[in-house]
Amino acid sequence: MSTHLSVNVNKIAVLRNSRGGQDPDVVQAARSCIAAGAHGITVHPRPDQRHIRADDVYALSTLTRMHGVEFNIEGNPFAPPRAGYPGLLELCRATRPQQVTLVPDGDGQLTSDHGVDFARDGARLAPLIAAFKTLGCRVSLFVDAGNPEIAQAAALGADRIELYTGPYAEAHHHGQSQPSLALFADAARRAHAAGLGINAGHDLSQHNLADFLAGVPDVLEVSIGHALVGEALYQGLEPTVRAYLAIIAGGATTAA
């Protein structure tokens, strides 16, 4: 099984929006990632439009279809439409991405930092998952590795989960990754047993990706943005994407 790399281009939009105008060009950055071999492009449009905007979503949808790579839209399915943000379901209706990842983040969060609460939100999620699937989208739910109810994602109709890897990255940074890897491996096995595909993302980097993939079975896709864009400032965007692909292929070790 080959793990796919989906590059999250949110941070390109952060840099653009910090100055206004169109530079750096999010579509051109995504095109470079695809040219380097990325299997897909991920975006997480937020209602406050702090980075990716609706017009970026439409343009990136066209680009990914043109190049035959996956488009993954992340977002909070409960966030209502507002000026400049038509809502996650409407964005997916307009662009029909191959995958939508449902993330329970609030408007004020700096970044996604927790997974779905099945007890609280399961009843609301089921009809939304069905609605996304009628659009032809594969549906993935953002989950915490320690959640005992991961199998509930399958019962709600989801196709995959995305394991929130922030805690693993923190543990790896402090040289304490083994207990975290055991937790994530158990989560992956439980998901697989329930018939779910396994994605992973958040704070994965060249420093920790190889160890994660070696320790966690059956990972179909990793979504990486913040670290990849940061590393690209030193290494260049296309070489950085190729470095990640080499790690995924087992052709490179973790970075020093």
From Swiss-Prot:
| Annotated Gene3D superfamilies | Aldolase class I
Q: Which NCBIfam families match?
A: pdxJ, PRK05265.1-4
One GO biological process term is: pyridoxine biosynthetic process
Provide the protein name. Pyridoxine 5'-phosphate synthase
Q: Which family does it belong to?
A: Belongs to the PNP synthase family.
Q: Where is this site: Transition state stabilizer?
A: E162
The residues that cross the membrane are none
Q: Which gene encodes it?
A: pdxJ
Is-annotated flag, keyword Glycoprotein? no
The job of this chain, per UniProt, is described as: Catalyzes the complicated ring closure reaction between the two acyclic compounds 1-deoxy-D-xylulose-5-phosphate (DXP) and 3-amino-2-oxopropyl phosphate (1-amino-acetone-3-phosphate or AAP) to form pyridoxine 5'-phosphate (PNP) and inorganic phosphate.
What SUPFAM superfamilies has UniProt attached to this entry?
Pyridoxine 5'-phosphate synthase
- The residues annotated as the active site are H44, E74, H202
Any GO CC annotation of this UniProt entry: cytosol
Q: Whom does it interact with, and what assembly results?
A: Homooctamer; tetramer of dimers.
Q: Which reaction does it catalyse?
A: 3-amino-2-oxopropyl phosphate + 1-deoxy-D-xylulose 5-phosphate = pyridoxine 5'-phosphate + phosphate + 2 H2O + H(+)
Query: Which EC number(s) are documented for this chain?
Result: 2.6.99.2
Kindly indicate whether the keyword Hydrolase belongs to this entry.
no
Quote the record's binding site residues for 1-deoxy-D-xylulose 5-phosphate.
R46, H51, T111
Any idea which positions bind 3-amino-2-oxopropyl phosphate? N8, R19, D203, G225, H226
Pathway linked to the protein: Cofactor biosynthesis; pyridoxine 5'-phosphate biosynthesis; pyridoxine 5'-phosphate from D-erythrose 4-phosphate: step 5/5
> Which InterPro entries does the UniProt record give?
Aldolase_TIM, PyrdxlP_synth_PdxJ, Pyridoxine-5'_phos_synth
Q: Which organism is it from?
A: Xanthomonas campestris pv. campestris (strain ATCC 33913 / DSM 3586 / NCPPB 528 / LMG 568 / P 25)
Keywords annotated in UniProt: Cytoplasm, Pyridoxine biosynthesis, Transferase
Q: Which GO terms describe its molecular function?
A: pyridoxine 5'-phosphate synthase activity
What is one Pfam family matched by this protein?
PdxJ
